[in-house]
Amino acid sequence: EPCIPKWKSCVNRHGDCCAGLECWKRRKSFEVCVPKV
């Protein structure tokens, strides 16, 4: 499976974000891969 790019949904695939990204639950929204801070 290819990794999930930035701003794309990672629901049910929390460990699949591309390098440097992490799955984050946005307020009142869905989970997306975002850059780690």
Curated annotation (Swiss-Prot):
GO cellular component: extracellular region
Coiled coil feature spans: none
One example GO MF annotation: toxin activity
Metal-binding listed as a keyword: no
Keywords, comma-separated and alphabetical: Disulfide bond, Ion channel impairing toxin, Knottin, Neurotoxin, Proton-gated sodium channel impairing toxin, Secreted, Toxin
Subcellular location: Secreted
Covalent S-S links between cysteines: C3-C18, C10-C23, C17-C33
Keyword Coiled coil: no
Tissue: Expressed by the venom gland.
Miscellaneous information on this protein: Is more stable than psalmotoxin-1 (AC P60514) when challenged with either high temperature or human serum.
The family this protein is said to belong to: Belongs to the psalmotoxin-1 family.
Domain notes: The presence of a 'disulfide through disulfide knot' structurally defines this protein as a knottin.
Chain's role: This toxin acts on different isoforms of acid-sensing ion channel ASIC1 in a similar manner to psalmotoxin-1 (AC P60514). On ASIC1a homotrimer, it provokes a pH-dependent inhibition (IC(50)=39.7 nM on human and IC(50)=1.3 nM on rat channels), whereas it potentiates ASIC1b homotrimer and ASIC1a-ASIC1b heterotrimer (EC(50)=178.1 nM on human ASIC1b, EC(50)=46.5 nM on rat ASIC1b and EC(50)=17.4 nM on rat ASIC1a-ASIC1b channels).
The name this protein goes by in its record: Pi-theraphotoxin-Hm3a
Organism: Heteroscodra maculata
Classification of source organism: Eukaryota, Metazoa, Ecdysozoa, Arthropoda, Chelicerata
